Amino acid sequence: MLEDLRLYQLISPSLPVGSFTYSQGLEWAIEKGWVTNVTELKHWLSNQLMDSLATLELPVLAKLTQLLQQEEWQQAQDWCDFIIANRETKELRLEERQRGLAFSMLLPKLGIELNQTTLPMVKQTQVAAFALAANHWNLTPTKLAAAYAWGWLENAVIVGIKLVPLGQSAGQQLLLEMADVIPQAVEKSQHWPEHLIGSFTPAQVLASSRHESQYTRLFRS
């Protein structure tokens, strides 16, 4: 049970790495009227969940977990590089590294030691941090993937509540509905071919690139 509680701590939007400060382009999409209500937000998030998390982050997370456990350092580093290469805007790459840097300071406090090989990976991408935590706490791949997806979803809904804006009840209802999609995303990720790993979310990429120069904004991405 303690391992599960530690995992819940890692995926919290407010703690420990400040995920709440990022919208991943959603702030600009709301500003420009692409997302104006709970139905449109659900569509936006569903596309990201099934066409990015399920086809990029979650498959790479599973691979990194296995490779780091086997001490296949070079292959693990290659997948960390791959994650960064798939962050298609400057602020998305910066977000990935900022979260990774925060995890590099947090993990040792949780008893997960980093060495000269794993530290640069964690600083590069938070995905490596989750993989190391999974090995340290003996988490199953399915539990790890579901938790990672839930942390992303909860943060995105919080952004929607603040900016669309949505009421708290509408936000909770959206979480309930989207939670039903997470098992589908996890299953998809577990059967996704290696040669197809990547994301296809052009609207998010455009929104993120425009958010970089948005005049007034609350979020860092």
Curated annotation (Swiss-Prot):
One of its GO terms (cellular component) is cytoplasm. Keywords: Chaperone, Cytoplasm, Nickel insertion. It holds the Pfam family UreF. One of its GO terms (molecular function) is nickel cation binding. InterPro entries: UreF (IPR002639), UreF_sf (IPR038277). PANTHER family: UREASE ACCESSORY PROTEIN F (PTHR33620:SF1). Belongs to the UreF family. UreD, UreF and UreG form a complex that acts as a GTP-hydrolysis-dependent molecular chaperone, activating the urease apoprotein by helping to assemble the nickel containing metallocenter of UreC. The UreE protein probably delivers the nickel. Required for maturation of urease via the functional incorporation of the urease nickel metallocenter. This is Urease accessory protein UreF.
